[in-house]
């Protein structure tokens, strides 16, 4: 039965404050100047979907997943103890975490259906029409409130879903996943999490005095027009690219790019170009692509175990007419140039820029922001002792301009990249047509395969 047609109930137990399993330091820790920018002062939600355990994955002890997850989270907070604290704001809007050990919010719940009643769990992807029942509604206050809200929903078949809402100023998606994986490992009996978490927020703080050494177009308005007034709602959809789709797109590139471009470069360039065309910008309008780049590997030595905000936002800027009127290779080159900007010096320069400019939000007007979470969110190793997650990742895109690549499967069982994105309904047909041209009439799937009332039904 399709999830959109299915009525079911979820009974929640009383949410509780879950603290660290052992005493933790009581201290005030200053966040980085990347952590407290306006663009991350919000909550994000992640979902992890687990099928019923098999004979090989079933724990030998008599327990249930919620109790194992509860225990693992409590143990993980001994190492990631700032997550058990509360955010405070000081002079000049500077944020710190007060490590009070108060804990996170944890809730058990039970659904009165089988997990497969939601659809094929391996192909579930945003938008999730059932997400409100799986997620705690609290979690809008950035200051003085719990930093993490976890709900474990058990299904009649033995499968379960974990959702985690977390305060983005404390961690990015890879950082929160690191915390959840540590909890899963500890629940299974690990003595310490690997890698061990590191704080090191000073690596992402501004210098004294600040000195901006790059043009940070991600935060700078470059001949931007005022936002277009519109009352039309934007809807969330998901595109799916198989390896064959990527190969088809790659074949359209110049020889040097065919060898050098990654699948992220190609998919992002395709999505950006088609999106700009679908939104019908004027040919002289400035459009911007922001690429989220993991900066942890840009330090020497790399910041292994860093769970703060480490995704930098370098931008490419061009005119809409030039982007749409050029071949795909032009867009791919811009993606690669943006990615290549990020170095340790770039990180310092970005922190300096943010401090000098009031911790501004990244530019939203005429912008498309994309991150690659396929390797940064390790579902294959997210095992609490009941088997591995088969799908999951961020629940939504947060803002209309944001998108990401995540690993998924289509209804035929092919692995590929799912790309959630937002568009006004009036632009969706044009977007579909543009992608159709580039992938040579190969199908572009959307969430309609499992969530027909939220996706678009067009087949290319």
UniProtKB/Swiss-Prot annotation:
A Pfam family matched in the record: Transferase
Subcellular locations according to the entry: Cytoplasm
Catalytic reaction(s) noted: piperidine + (E,E)-piperoyl-CoA = piperine + CoA + H(+)
Cellular component aspect of the GO annotation: cytoplasm
Active-site annotation: 168, 383
Motif (Microbody targeting signal): 458-460
Keywords (A to Z) from UniProt: Acyltransferase, Cytoplasm, Transferase
Segments of this protein annotated with the region Disordered: 1-23
Keyword Cytoplasm listed: yes
Protein name listed in UniProt: Piperamide synthase
Organism: Piper nigrum
Lineage of the organism: Eukaryota, Viridiplantae, Streptophyta, Embryophyta, Tracheophyta
């Amino acid at each position: 039965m399709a999830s959109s047609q299915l009525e079911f109930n979820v009974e929640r137990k009383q949410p509780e404050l879950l603290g660290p399993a052992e005493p933790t330091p009581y201290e005030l820790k200053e966040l980085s100047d990347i952590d407290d920018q306006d663009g991350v002062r919000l909550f994000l939600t992640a979902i992890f979907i687990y099928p019923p355990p098999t004979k090989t994955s079933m724990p030998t002890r008599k327990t249930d997943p919620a109790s194992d997850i509860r225990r693992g989270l409590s143990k993980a907070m001994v190492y990631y103890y700032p997550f058990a604290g509360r955010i405070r704001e000081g002079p000049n809007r500077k944020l710190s975490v007060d490590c009070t050990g108060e804990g996170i919010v944890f809730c058990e719940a039970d659904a009165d259906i089988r997990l497969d009643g939601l659809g094929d769990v391996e192909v579930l992807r945003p938008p999730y029409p059932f997400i409100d029942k799986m997620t705690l509604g609290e979690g809008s206050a950035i200051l003085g409130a719990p930093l993490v809200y976890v709900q474990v929903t058990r299904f009649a078949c033995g499968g379960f879903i974990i959702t985690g809402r977390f305060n983005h100023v404390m961690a990015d998606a890879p950082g929160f996943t690191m915390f959840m994986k540590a909890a899963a490992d500890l629940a299974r009996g690990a003595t310490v999490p690997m890698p061990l978490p590191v704080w090191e927020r000073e690596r992402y703080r501004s210098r004294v005095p600040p000195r901006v050494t790059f043009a940070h177009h991600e935060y700078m308005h470059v001949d931007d027009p005022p936002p277009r007034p519109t009352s039309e709602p934007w809807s969330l959809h998901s595109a799916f690219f198989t390896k064959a789709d990527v190969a088809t797109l790659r074949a359209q590139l110049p020889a040097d790019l065919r060898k050098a471009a990654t699948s992220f470069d190609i998919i992002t360039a395709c999505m950006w170009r088609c999106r700009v065309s679908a939104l019908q910008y004027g040919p002289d309008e400035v459009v911007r692509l922001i690429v989220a780049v993991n900066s942890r590997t840009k330090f020497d030595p790399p910041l292994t175990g860093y769970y703060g905000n480490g995704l930098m936002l370098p931008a490419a800027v061009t005119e809409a007419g030039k982007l749409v009127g050029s071949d795909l290779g032009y867009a791919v080159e811009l993606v690669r140039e943006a990615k290549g900007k990020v170095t340790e010096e770039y990180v310092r320069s970005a922190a300096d820029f943010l401090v000098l400019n009031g911790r501004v939000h990244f530019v939203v007007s005429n912008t498309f922001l994309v991150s690659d979470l396929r390797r940064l969110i390790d579902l294959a190793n997210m095992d609490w002792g009941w088997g591995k997650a088969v799908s999951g990742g961020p629940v939504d895109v947060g803002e209309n301009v944001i998108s990401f690549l995540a690993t998924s499967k289509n209804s035929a069982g092919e692995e590929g990249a799912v790309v959630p994105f937002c568009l006004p309904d009036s632009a969706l047909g044009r977007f579909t047509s543009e992608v159709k041209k580039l992938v040579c009439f190969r199908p572009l799937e959307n969430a309609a395969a499992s969530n027909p009332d939220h996706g678009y039904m067009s087949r290319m």
